[in-house]
């Protein structure tokens, strides 16, 4: 029976499908590109003008924002992102998620902004690095404990 089913699977013919024609004429694609670029230009404020207070987002951290001269310039042509997966303590994750939800930002943009802010403040950056090193050693100790516990359960 299994040989018969295997033979049927091997000999099964795939349906014939006509090849797709995905080629778009060059003039249409150029029109779409220029239209998209025009929409981007109209939606983004000019980089040499500064935003008025009405345009600035209201936030609890407005006093600690980056200076206008030090703000990174984001342009659609050079903007690249990298996908990362990070492990965060569940309580910290929940509190950060709540903060980001209230402020209507993402964890990624919060992390970027915090890093850029700390780069301007070397003393605070040193404190954060010290705290991060302490948390890393705690995590390593917990991982060692869990590993030893698992090994003990396997051998006993």
Curated annotation (Swiss-Prot):
A type 1 McdB protein. Keywords: Bacterial microcompartment, Carbon dioxide fixation, Carboxysome, Coiled coil, Plasmid. GO terms for cellular component: carboxysome. This is Maintenance of carboxysome distribution protein B. Residues 1-79 are annotated as: Disordered. It is found in: Carboxysome. The keyword Coiled coil applies. The keyword Coiled coil applies. Residues 51-63 have a biased composition (Basic and acidic residues). GO terms for biological process: carbon fixation. It comes from Gloeothece citriformis (strain PCC 7424) (Cyanothece sp. (strain PCC 7424)). Residues 24-50 have a biased composition (Polar residues). McdA and McdB together mediate carboxysome (Cb) spacing, size, ultrastructure and probably inheritance in the cell, together they prevent Cb aggregation. McdA is an ATPase that forms dynamic gradients on the nucleoid in response to adapter protein McdB, which associates with carboxysomes. The interplay between McdA gradients on the nucleoid and McdB-bound carboxysomes result in the equal spacing of Cbs along the cell length. Stimulates the ATPase activity of McdA, causing McdA to be released from DNA. Undergoes liquid-liquid phase separation. Incorrect positioning (aggregation) of carboxysomes results in reduced CO(2) fixation by encapsulated ribulose-1,5-bisphosphate carboxylase (RuBisCO, cbbL/cbbS), which leads to slower growth. Residues 122-156 form a coiled coil. Homodimerizes; may exist in higher order oligomers in solution. Forms a complex with McdA:DNA. Homohexamerizes, interacts with shell components of the carboxysome. Residues 1-55 are annotated as: Required for interaction with McdA:DNA complex.
């Amino acid at each position: 029976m299994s040989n018969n089913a295997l033979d049927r699977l091997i000999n099964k013919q795939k349906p014939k499908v006509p090849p797709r024609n995905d080629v778009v004429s060059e003039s249409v694609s150029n029109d779409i590109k220029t239209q998209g670029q025009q929409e981007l230009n109209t939606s983004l404020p000019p980089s040499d003008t500064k935003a008025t207070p009405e345009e600035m987002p209201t936030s609890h951290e407005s006093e600690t924002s980056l200076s206008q001269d030090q703000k990174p310039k984001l342009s659609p042509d050079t903007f690249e992102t990298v996908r990362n997966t990070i492990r965060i303590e569940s309580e910290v994750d929940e509190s950060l998620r709540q903060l980001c939800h209230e402020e209507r930002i993402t964890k990624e943009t919060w992390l970027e902004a915090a890093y850029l802010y700390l780069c301007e403040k070397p003393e605070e950056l040193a404190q954060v690095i010290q705290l991060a090193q302490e948390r890393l050693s705690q995590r390593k100790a917990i991982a060692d404990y869990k590993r030893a516990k698992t090994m003990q359960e396997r051998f006993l």
